[in-house]
Amino acid sequence: MRQTKTGILLANLGTPDAPTPEAVKRYLKQFLSDRRVVDTSRLLWWPLLRGVILPLRSPRVAKLYASVWMEGGSPLMVYSRQQQQALAQRLPETPVALGMSYGSPSLESAVNELLAEHVDHIVVLPLYPQFSCSTVGAVWDELARILARKRSIPGISFIRDYADNHDYINALANSVRASFAKHGEPDLLLLSYHGIPQRYADEGDDYPQRCRTTTRELASALGMAPEKVMMTFQSRFGREPWLMPYTDETLKMLGEKGVGHIQVMCPGFAADCLETLEEIAEQNREVFLGAGGKKYEYIPALNATPEHIEMMANLVAAYR
């Protein structure tokens, strides 16, 4: 029987190549052109995107990226590369490639990198713990487009999500415990997930249920009372309703009600990025403290910590 050679493809959203208006514009154009992200009529969306959104948002977003940019690139790219390298060290006989839905390195370059290693089976791990059509679905779509152009197609194992994976929950719980040990136990642990339009959930995207699953399992692992753990949604865009409650509005309300000490974790982000380091760690800190809160701490993403890499290795083991 012929032995199968397996490769692993780590997939994430992507990032601009530089914290400049031009680079951000290229990235946002690709990102916001995906129907999985924005499914508005193209006749309405194209003029709005190209004539209003890209010219106005790109310079402002570039400044935000510049505020968190690292020596090796954007935080998402730096931590994603660290994850790829650490997993490759953990699994020395298995090629590991990194691909992004938008920007570089592309998913196509990652597939080609693995095929150049003569793999005939690829385990695809989208680094989105909670499934959504707008994230995991986008990886699936692009992978199908890539393989449709190939004469020979490798076997594919596609990991839909890992919202209640035991190792994932334990890694989150240990990260929370470390933060509590360092900063003291807060009045409230707030778990902020990236939002999606409410309409997507109404049409069948089970993302909110998967977020609730992670929240429930994490609270149980920590032994925390339900009233001391709250789930919210961040990063809304546009005018239509998104999943609620909104993170920023909730933090303002909690500060005004006299909640003194909050710690915030973003379980849906496998690596720190603009949305965690700038929006949550900085903008929302100002919202909470400005509303009367006394102490606010952001708990970093799992990034390339040993526990996170071990979780990835265990997760893909069943498919190798």
Swiss-Prot record:
Question: Which pathway does the UniProt entry assign to this protein?
Answer: Porphyrin-containing compound metabolism; protoheme biosynthesis; protoheme from protoporphyrin-IX: step 1/1
| Cellular component terms (Gene Ontology) | cytoplasm
Where is this protein found? Cytoplasm
Keyword Metal-binding included in the entry's annotation: yes
State the InterPro entries in the record. Answer: Ferrochelatase (IPR001015), Ferrochelatase_AS (IPR019772), Ferrochelatase_C (IPR033644), Ferrochelatase_N (IPR033659)
Q: What is its EC number?
A: 4.98.1.1
Q: Does the keyword Lyase apply?
A: yes
Pfam families per the UniProt record, alphabetical: Ferrochelatase
Per the UniProt entry, what is one GO biological process? heme biosynthetic process
HAMAP family with a match to the protein in the record = Ferrochelatase (MF_00323)
Q: Which PANTHER family match?
A: FERROCHELATASE, FERROCHELATASE, MITOCHONDRIAL
So what family is this one in? Belongs to the ferrochelatase family.
- What is the official name of this protein in its record? Ferrochelatase
Organism per entry: Escherichia coli O8 (strain IAI1)
| Lineage start | Bacteria, Pseudomonadati, Pseudomonadota, Gammaproteobacteria, Enterobacterales
**Gene name linked to the record:** hemH
